[in-house]
Amino acid sequence: MAAVVLVTAALIICQIFPVKAADDENLYALSAVLMDGENGRVLYGKEAYKGRPNASTTKVMTCILALELAKGDDYVQVSGNAASQPQTRLGMREGQQFYLEDLLYSLMLKSHNDSAVAIAEHIGGSVEGFAEKMNEKAKELGCKDTHFVTPNGLDGEDEGGIHHTTARDLALIMAYAIKNATFVHITQTRDYTFTDISGKKHYSVHNTNAFLDMETGVISGKTGFTGNAGYCYVCAVRQDERLFIVALLGCGWPGNKNYKWSDTKKLLSYGRENYQYVMLPEFPQLPEILVTEAAPGKEDPYPQKSDHSGYPPKQVMLKIHAVLSEKDRGKRYLLKKTETITWETELPDKLPAPIQKNQKIGTLHAKLNGKELLSCLVTADDKIDRITYKWYVDKVFKDYFH
């Protein structure tokens, strides 16, 4: 039966000033999340996992998919469906053609609904086809309760349910999107002008993300509003090397347009005053594992228990080590002063030979507040052969006939 050993590694964390925690009552949003943008850990959540309509914050997914699945110089043909989308819209006409890159600025700066549909139909063949790609990507990113029906965030419903996401999932999507430099460049642009491919129609769009100029370190952001969703907002901010993602759903209705800025500032302040990055602690010292029915190696490297019979014992001790995957090396986490990461090693009491070098022996789990952050393999340092009848025959022949 596996023996579970808990080893707590003390972490030295920079001093930070204690502040009052972000209380649900202090936020206007129905759902809110403050996330560690480097690893997706939720630092604060208010109904973080409750599904809600998310309006034009949907366009974060539309944009990142377009950047990954198409080229900026693609010709996008406008359909009647795209041209008939409600406000806010660019005002494109059926049959017009645009470069995809220009429509991405229209999509993310001014949040044009017709541009979203034109992009979706170009890439997915239809709105429905593009929605399938959106939902596939959401699952790939680890979203737990997200279902996309429309590329612009307008209310929609299909056999999979209504168009919705959660504050946690929305933050996760933004954390992924900002890894794309072109996405960041587009969403940081204040003003952009372009024409259709014919060059006859000129357009100018201004970024509606006013938060770009309210705080230092804003990397990206997207606003949204429908009568059903209320005001929504998601942004990424890096301050003092700390990467925060804020996601807000249902943050007020007309007359309270600035609630989203207030909530975002509160959450960022809470993050700055309570969290500092720390690296993973050192691995704990791992025990040696008893290996039964083992034959010694050529140099007999293992400590053995002699039975004075002239033959080797059948038990040796195996040294083991933990290995972090390449993707987990250098990971760090935003922690409060009172938080520590613990290592939990899951290892067998003993194993039978043979054992191969670098064979998996167990697992080492990094946990915080009882939740797993990551896991890594524990492997064998050396090879151990199994002692067999042939080994005994060879031993006798060597000892008595040579």
Q: Where are the model-predicted features located?
A:
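Domain-terminus/edge residues, biased toward the C-terminal soluble/receptor-binding domains
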Residues: 161-402
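Active-site-adjacent loops and short helices of periplasmic peptidoglycan-processing enzymes
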Residues: 16-181, 198
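Generic detector of short alpha-helix boundary/capping microenvironments
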Residues: 6-9, 27-28, 50-51, 83, ...
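Short, ordered coil/turn segments that flank beta-strands lining enzyme active or ligand-binding pockets
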Residues: 1, 19, 37-38, 239, ...
